[in-house]
Amino acid sequence: MIQVLLVIICLAVFPYQGSSIILESGNVNDFELVYPKKVTVLPTGAMNSAHPCCDPVMCKPKRGEHCISGPCCRNCKFLSPGTICKKAWGDDMNDYCTGISSDCPRNPWKD
């Protein structure tokens, strides 16, 4: 019920920001912001806390910030391209940040 109310409030107050929607992700305090071609996971309680990267009123990262959380997000900014976000394990290779996402894309190549 809370999740539906938050979506309605966001869409009613910011009708031209309809490209972002809040989705429940299992726990009442865990939400995801969905942008075109991008999903950013909000940390637990971000919707009702003073998280430094999150603007809960606008339902997205604060102005000038790139991300809220993720393996390629530090201090509200994407990590530089080529930063290792997952070290090699077994016959797998390192995975690297792209510089344009907070996600850690899987390296499809093997040694």
Swiss-Prot record:
Organism: Echis ocellatus (Ocellated saw-scaled viper)
GO CC annotation terms, alphabetical: extracellular region
Pfam families in UniProt: Disintegrin (PF00200)
Propeptide: 21-46, 110-111
Signal peptide: 1-20
Superkingdom of origin: Eukaryota
Keyword Repressor listed: no
Record domain Disintegrin: where: 26-111
Record carries keyword Methyltransferase: no
Protein name (Swiss-Prot/TrEMBL): Disintegrin Eo1 subunit 1
Entry similarity comment: Belongs to the disintegrin family. Dimeric disintegrin subfamily.
